[in-house]
UniProtKB/Swiss-Prot annotation:
A GO term for molecular function: structural constituent of ribosome
Keyword Ribosomal protein: yes
InterPro entries documented for this protein: Ribosomal_eL39 (IPR000077), Ribosomal_eL39_CS (IPR020083), Ribosomal_eL39_dom_sf (IPR023626)
Gene Ontology BP annotations: translation
UniProt source species: Tetrahymena thermophila (strain SB210)
Family from the record: Belongs to the eukaryotic ribosomal protein eL39 family.
Protein name according to UniProt: Large ribosomal subunit protein eL39
Listed Pfam families: Ribosomal_L39
One cellular component term from this protein's GO annotations in UniProt: cytosolic large ribosomal subunit
Superkingdom of the source species: Eukaryota
Length: 52
């Protein structure tokens, strides 16, 4: 991908960057939740984004 990106593309990349992080520990320690990890985590080598 080149260096020139449109604003919409940058927005999408920003959103994907924010989504691609682990759960906060305080949320994991809450008593009424069964969620242990972020199942939608993405690795930059394995799964590519469908943004062109």
């Amino acid at each position: 991908m080149g260096a020139n990106k449109t604003l919409n593309m940058k927005k999408r990349f920003g959103r994907k960057i924010k989504q691609n992080r682990p759960l906060p520990n305080w949320y994991r320690y809450k008593s009424d939740t069964n969620i242990r990890y972020n199942s939608k985590r993405r690795n930059w080598r394995r799964t590519k984004l469908k943004i062109y």
